[in-house]
């Protein structure tokens, strides 16, 4: 081997040794790390692709909207505070600023735990509810000043420029009406059969101390496009459900003092409503479930529409201004009674409360006003009572003369009334004419939100009963408490009945009934609002005072002289044919009875 070859072999050997020592351990490690990273990256990509594939399979073009960040935005005016959520572009919470709940806290008509609402449809056989989608918005909290309107826009882009979901909420500077303008643009090919529902579930929050009275007044009302008002039963502990096949203009979840409702510019095609008892009676009143179908055209969904929500008190002014027929959420009684409430009681009450802050005094002044209004009828009734008082000795003599022969007694009484020129019904007619006003009060006070949480004397709340004693047991038809205003009303009514009976002297069952009726009302009114019992009690007191005042201006001697003159005049005049036939009929009846 020559010298050069030897040197070459030595150099190659040195290079191999150096290469093995410095590079052999590093290269395999680097290769292994690179391979692991590539596998992990590829696995991650596979998982992401699988997740996206599943998401797309479930929600299609709505897939990306199922993930996002929730943003709450507040729209607030002087009456209401509405919290909107970008998660569903929905109403999350509603606070009525002018009212408190029974614990003295701000009254939450709705909140996230009690209510949920949104549009529902199927897309590629997958169920979609907008309250699960995340909308985009750049708007912030807004307090709406006078003569301005707050506005919040939520939108979901769906890929193409002409494909999006949009919901715009607006709130004026005052009032309880929230408007929602919604659009489904470019989605007609992605909604199965063109069917879109609006779903609203509400666990109706408790706001009153007397939860049972509130529960008895809570229901779902709805108003059809043909202007027909309907509702589910109120006084029931059972589940109430109804399927509606007629177009619906609005529906409302109505409580005793507050209502949450929705009105649509394009009537809903149909709907299903359900009301059932709650499983949490201390927290909620009832549970309401409503599903209504939006109008469609040849299996194509409508792309836009307007909803108006009402979240507010059951005051006639606010309800009536919201939508046609919406005032029916305030029950004021049968037609005649309702007209008296609308055009007499409510205007007078509203006028008085502008100047008087104590609602016990408001009721007192209301009684005085009504009594003055009815004074002509009361005067007529009292004159009739005075005439009967003058005739009482003669009537007693007739009863003593004929004993148990009631037919003869009645015949002689008719003859006496005719001779004296007295109409025995003249005292009853004024009383009957006053009955619609008494019935109007019976409907007005239980629904008067103005009395809610207003104290007077020992009653902490005139809108509910004034319990001076809570009993450890339940009395059937009476309750487990004692209402003092109801006792006072009952006592004053019995006293008035006794006073009236001293003049009219009813006999037999009529006398018993006259005393039994106040006792019956004591059982009925024991759980009614204290304001109603107080009104009836004060009304009785003023009736006594009114009669005493009228008595000072009525001369009984003049009444006696008038009756004597009428008797003399009747004796000189021939009997009219009708009166003669009437008397003959009574005589014939008496004769027939005698033959038997």
Curated annotation (Swiss-Prot):
Gene3D superfamilies: 2.70.98.90
Residue ranges the record marks as coiled coil: none
Transmembrane segments: 4-24, 332-352, 359-379, 425-445, 468-488, 518-538
Keywords: Cell inner membrane, Cell membrane, Chaperone, Membrane, Protein transport, Transmembrane, Transmembrane helix, Transport
Domain of life assignment: Bacteria
Region of interest (Disordered), ranges: 565-596
Membrane topology category: Multi-pass membrane protein
Subcellular location: Cell inner membrane
InterPro entries per UniProt: Membr_insert_YidC, Membr_insert_YidC_N, YidC/ALB3/OXA1/COX18, YidC/Oxa/ALB_C, YidC_ALB_C, YidC_periplasmic_sf
Listed GO biological process terms: protein insertion into membrane; protein transport
Primary location recorded for the protein, binned into one broad class: membrane
GO molecular function: membrane insertase activity
Comp. bias (Basic and acidic residues): 565-584
GO annotation, cellular component aspect: plasma membrane
Record's subunit section: Interacts with the Sec translocase complex via SecD. Specifically interacts with transmembrane segments of nascent integral membrane proteins during membrane integration.
Family indicated by similarity: Belongs to the OXA1/ALB3/YidC family. Type 1 subfamily.
Physiological role: Required for the insertion and/or proper folding and/or complex formation of integral membrane proteins into the membrane. Involved in integration of membrane proteins that insert both dependently and independently of the Sec translocase complex, as well as at least some lipoproteins. Aids folding of multispanning membrane proteins.
HAMAP family named among the record's database cross-references: YidC_type1
Protein's name in the database: Membrane protein insertase YidC
